[in-house]
Amino acid sequence: MTTALIFAGGTGRRMNSRSKPKQFLEMHGKPIIIYTLEYFEYHDDVDTIVVVCIREWIDELKGLLKRFGISKVSRIVPGGETGHDSIYCGLKSMKDICKKDDIVLIHDGVRPLITKQLITQNIEAAKKYGNAITSETARESIVRSTDGEIICEVPPRSQMYTAKAPQTFYYGKILDLYERAKRDGKKSIDSAHLCNLYGEAMHIVVSTPNNIKITEPADYYIYRALYEAMEGQQIFGL
């Protein structure tokens, strides 16, 4: 079985949106979270979806699922204090529906320009290599600094990637890593970071360049422009 675990627990403080969290902001009458969920809803290889959501917005999400016909969501789980905690909450909630050798795709609810092909590539790579980390090749030079003032390293751009999502694993393995982190008192930025903390080898699936995460106000307008451009291509057959 393949499960999509969608993280929609962020409050979106950087979006300066006081009325609602960023994942519930609308474009053309549809919330961002629904655009994201639809890709997994309509993918033949995804059997079920689990969503981690802000507790106060769970009822709102339930209404949206019904309104937009999202039927694969089997449960909605309250999030934790951090992204790490929220993913762990989601993984724990799946113990009664997932076997150790099932596949789980961990994805951001505010990353709505994923593609069917990228989901397929993640599933296939995870089955073959044990995991799949969607990553984009670096377009500009990346520098490293330990104090925020002095550059101590400029790694070769050809070796640099940006980790994105989905990040896909065997369920038993990724759950074990989060449980180890809890015992050890460790926190991670994302699941790829957690794998690195424990010395796990990871396999790259190259991302599409438009697989953006909506974090700040400018991201929303970039997303809208990209979405409308893709819609225009379909309408005019470009």
Q: Model-found features: residue ranges?
A:
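N-terminal glycine-rich phosphate-binding loop and ensuing alpha1 helix
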Residues: 2-59
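Residue-level signal for inorganic ion chemistry
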Residues: 6, 33, 90, 108, ...
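Hydrophobic packing residues within well-ordered alpha-helices of enzyme cores
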Residues: 15, 40, 61-65, 122, ...
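Short aromatic/basic micro-patch
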Residues: 26, 113, 168, 213-214
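Conserved N-terminal catalytic core of the sugar/cofactor nucleotidyltransferase
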Residues: 34-101, 182-184
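Short beta-strand-to-loop acidic/aromatic patch adjacent to the donor-nucleotide binding site
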Residues: 98-110
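Conserved core of the sugar-phosphate nucleotidyltransferase
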Residues: 113-205, 238
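Hydrophobic helical membrane-anchoring modules
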Residues: 211-238
